[in-house]
Amino acid sequence: MKFNSISPNKQHHTGFTTSNNENLNQQLNQVLILLQTLQSQAKKIASFQNQTYEWNLKHHQNLKNVLKSFNRLNSIIDSKGSNNELNEKDNNEFENGVTFHQKIINTYDPLDPFSEELENLIMQIDRGLFHQLRDDSLEIIYPFILKWLKENNSLVLSLVLIWESSTKFHYLLNKKKFKEINKKILDCIVDYENKGIISTLINQNEFPFSDDEYNNLKKFLNDYS
């Protein structure tokens, strides 16, 4: 009688413990999944922060050099004195009389349109050299802008080249092949904005555009795409 009287209690106690263990295991699994999700998100955030930092570090000196050679957009040539200085620079740039336009044409290889030699030459460009360009040489240079933006390289130089091209070669950039490039360029710029890179450059005083100029630049790309 004594054995029979406690047997049901033991059976009930055993069932209760098993149920608790199952609930506990489910809760632990849910916590584990949550922790794994948080860990994955934390890794993505850390990776993005590291990439942004590395990008800024890698291109900081290049950005400074570009700004020195091009100056800021608010110093665009608009006086006779500046134009005289520009003409003197153009005349003295190549002692052998070869213009930057001709240098681009001579270096360009249609079988290797993005050759390292050509890219290094283009990276030497400044305002005086830019004004030596002609339609043919700009057609060679312009695709490099998209290449650089896709590679997170030479952002400021790319934007300034677009600005200058929109002023001097606007008729050329209205062609179909340039419109396709402009659309992709605008997508890249929006991506830079979303990643906070543009705002970082602005905060570091390394962005050569005022708000109005930057908006006009994007409007041009949108209208010509």
Curated annotation (Swiss-Prot):
Residue stretches of biased makeup (Polar residues): 1-19
Region spans: Disordered: 1-21
Lineage: Eukaryota, Amoebozoa, Evosea, Eumycetozoa, Dictyostelia
Highest rank taxon of the organism: Eukaryota
UniProt-recorded name of the protein: Putative uncharacterized protein DDB_G0268712
